[in-house]
Amino acid sequence: MFGLRMPELLLILAIVVILFGASRLPALGAGLGQGIRSFKKAFGGEDEKPTASGNGSTPTQSSSDQGSKQA
């Protein structure tokens, strides 16, 4: 991997943490991921995949809704 070993990678990680701060790293990673996804989508390299947020396309009915329909 470009001739980088563990000590060099740890040094790069330490510099990134010092520059951006540990609290901003998740936001930077999320922004980078969204940018890569939109770039792939623009070139047709990736289809839209469902997210794990729990917002499924099929709505579920609660038991109280089912009970009122039977009565």
From Swiss-Prot:
UniProt keyword Oxidoreductase present: no
The organism's taxonomic lineage, starting at the top: Bacteria, Pseudomonadati, Myxococcota, Myxococcia, Myxococcales
The protein's assembly and partners: The Tat system comprises two distinct complexes: a TatABC complex, containing multiple copies of TatA, TatB and TatC subunits, and a separate TatA complex, containing only TatA subunits. Substrates initially bind to the TatABC complex, which probably triggers association of the separate TatA complex to form the active translocon.
GO MF, one annotated term: protein transmembrane transporter activity
Function: Part of the twin-arginine translocation (Tat) system that transports large folded proteins containing a characteristic twin-arginine motif in their signal peptide across membranes. TatA could form the protein-conducting channel of the Tat system.
UniProt-listed InterPro entries: TatA/B/E, TatA/E
GO aspect biological process, one term: protein transport by the Tat complex
UniProt family annotation: Belongs to the TatA/E family.
Cited Gene3D superfamilies: 1.20.5.3310
Residue ranges, annotated region (Disordered): 43-71
Biased segments, Polar residues type: 52-71
Keyword list, A-Z: Cell inner membrane, Cell membrane, Membrane, Protein transport, Translocation, Transmembrane, Transmembrane helix, Transport
Localization, UniProt: Cell inner membrane
Annotated Gene Ontology cellular component terms: TAT protein transport complex
Transmembrane regions listed in the UniProt entry: 9-29
Record's bilayer topology term: Single-pass membrane protein
Protein's name in the database: Sec-independent protein translocase protein TatA
Any Pfam family hit: TatA_B_E
PANTHER family: SEC-INDEPENDENT PROTEIN TRANSLOCASE PROTEIN TATA (PTHR42982:SF1)
Organism whose genome encodes this protein: Anaeromyxobacter dehalogenans (strain 2CP-C)
